[in-house]
Swiss-Prot record:
Coiled coil: none annotated. It comes from Francisella tularensis subsp. tularensis (strain WY96-3418). The gene is hemH. It comes from the Bacteria. This is Ferrochelatase. Pfam families: Ferrochelatase (PF00762). It catalyses: heme b + 2 H(+) = protoporphyrin IX + Fe(2+). Keywords: Cytoplasm, Heme biosynthesis, Iron, Lyase, Metal-binding, Porphyrin biosynthesis.
Length: 333
């Protein structure tokens, strides 16, 4: 990131993504998962019982199990996870586009932490920080916990910066247009028209939705608005919605991505999958969808499977974020 002197406008924008292990070894993965799965916003359970289950069962098993999956998707050239690599590049590009703002990034779990970046921005003279969680759809498990951590950090500061937040952008016109265009461009590259475009969002325990989390509604609205943008141009394509990455025995939001793909496979359909809830490619897209779900789909009789990459550090993503920020805070040109 660029370093700014006091002559610059003392405003900053902090992009925040979910997080990643520092490396794909067991120790790094275990440390990351412990922080992530210890968040009561993520796992709503009896804290004493959950701590025992997490430390004695889940962490020892999942840390070892995930070494191979993280190694498979790891950007070995830069020795970074894809999520970290793309988020860092995205912030750097947006920083160059916004002359009067310091733009940086942080991870909710792992490194670089929200605390370290808020302190870094203060050291550069920022007295106002705009928090931009890179989650289009709001959930207490994602967006809310970002602000929990921001205000935890602020509670320890004697001189607090002014904090503003960018709203979830699940139905923002710039987001819908960008996702729609992304699908169009991908379809043009294919040799034949697919039977279905499947919108796969990260799942959530259904009880969270029942308690008032609006995540499902936000996902459905993103899906509906993009579908409305495309269905007239592609009348022979079915647009469907599903939820992936189920964890644990509880019922999660349905339909499940695995189940939908198996249904399509039995009908010998060709499928294009997009994961518009992820701002950057990560384990859930590069391994779960691109490898595991694809292999299962083909094995079950599916015809063709194609995954649309996330927006990542593309110029379209940079422009979209710029327009959303400008719309919300009226950027000073």
């Amino acid at each position: 990131m660029q370093q700014y002197s006091s002559k610059y406008n003392k405003q900053a924008i902090l992009l925040v993504n979910l997080g990643t292990p520092d490396n794909y070894d067991t120790k790094s993965i275990k440390r990351y998962l412990k922080e992530f799965l210890s968040d009561p916003r993520v796992i709503e359970a009896n804290p004493v019982l959950w701590k025992i289950i997490l430390n004695l069962i889940i962490l020892p098993i999942r840390a070892k199990k995930n070494v191979h999956t993280y190694k498979t998707v790891w950007n070995k050239q830069h020795n970074k996870s894809p999520l970290l690599f793309y988020t860092e590049n995205l912030a750097d590009k947006l920083d160059k586009k916004l002359d009067n703002y310091i733009v940086d990034y942080a991870m909710r779990y792992g490194n670089p932490s929200i605390e370290s970046k808020i302190k870094s921005l203060q050291d550069q003279g920022a007295t106002e920080i705009i928090i931009f969680p890179l989650y289009p759809q709001y959930s207490a498990t994602t967006t809310a916990t970002v602000y929990d951590e921001v205000y935890r950090v602020l509670s320890k500061l004697r001189w607090q910066p002014t904090i503003k937040g960018i709203n979830p952008y699940y139905d923002n016109k710039f987001h819908i247009q960008t996702i729609s265009q992304q699908i169009k461009e991908h379809l043009k590259k294919l040799d034949s028209t697919p039977d279905t475009v499947l919108f796969s969002f990260h799942g959530l325990p259904k009880e969270y939705f029942d308690k008032g989390d609006p995540y499902y509604c936000h996902c459905y609205k993103t899906y509906r608005l993009v579908k409305e943008e495309l269905q007239n141009e592609y009348p022979n394509i079915d647009f469907e919605l599903s939820f992936q990455s189920r964890f644990g025995p509880k019922k999660w939001l349905e339909p499940y991505t695995t189940v939908k793909l198996e249904e399509f496979a039995k009908q010998n359909k060709s499928v294009v999958v997009i994961a518009p809830g992820f701002s950057a490619d990560c384990l859930e897209t590069l391994e779960e969808l691109a490898i595991s779900e694809k292999e299962n789909f083909i094995k079950k009789g599916g015809k063709e499977f194609s995954l649309i990459p996330c927006l990542n550090d593309s110029n379209q993503h940079v422009d979209m974020l710029y327009n959303i920020i400008d719309e919300e805070i009226c950027l000073k040109k």
